[in-house]
Amino acid sequence: MPIVHVDCWEGIGEEKVKKMIRGITKAIADVGIPAHAVEIVVYEVPKTHWGVGGEPASEKLKDISPPK
């Protein structure tokens, strides 16, 4: 069944990750896939390892932080 991979900046926090997992699972279940068959993998990537427009996000987007 479906495996969903989510890439996000590190630091989003466990509660937000849990909420995201529940929300994604519900969205997939709403189209008829059994919730127990949905797998979700969340990768938290440091902004220093995330490129935007040829620069590390840590430099280009230094004023932006993950939601608290």
Show the residue positions of the predicted features.
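A domain-level signal for the structural core that forms small-molecule/cofactor-binding pockets
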Residues: 2-68
